[in-house]
A protein has these predicted regions:
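Solvent-exposed, well-ordered loop and adjacent helix/strand elements within mature globular domains
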Residues: 20-125
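Sec-dependent N-terminal signal peptides of Gram-positive bacterial secreted proteins and lipoproteins
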Residues: 1-22
Length: 125
């Protein structure tokens, strides 16, 4: 049996995964709503100073607060999300979204009343 080697395995993974990434939709301002990984994605644009202050106080760290070139608001390496805290407790990281891995820092009425699987992505649009 032929050995694949690291390069062969990486090439195989690329061939298998590329069609999924290429066909995956991404949340946009124009689209307004996106469905990704079994969850509904929407976006919101609010002042994040209180959200960031609470996160810094709770985590004892001061992650970089920044806005990506595509307008997505970030906390360190994570996309800032409003979610259902019963599904994703406050501070949960690595929540998959079409715009990258997120962190649960906010919530809203939508998360308890209309769609428990919805994530609201913080943006500057």
């Amino acid at each position: 049996m032929k050995k694949w080697g690291v390069l062969g395995v990486l090439l195989l993974m690329l061939v298998i995964l590329l069609p999924y990434k290429a066909n995956a939709s991404v949340l946009t301002k124009k689209g307004g709503v996106n469905y990704y990984n079994g969850q509904k994605e929407t976006y919101y644009n609010l002042n994040m100073s209180r959200i960031y202050a609470r996160a810094d106080a709770n985590f004892g760290s001061h992650h970089k607060k920044w806005i990506r070139e595509d307008g997505v608001k970030m906390y360190g390496p994570y996309v800032v999300l409003a979610v259902n805290f019963r599904k994703y407790p406050y501070g949960t990281t690595d929540i998959p979204t079409s715009l990258g891995l997120g962190i649960a820092l906010d919530t809203g009425a939508f998360a308890t009343e209309t769609n428990l699987d919805q994530v609201d992505v913080a943006v500057d649009w």
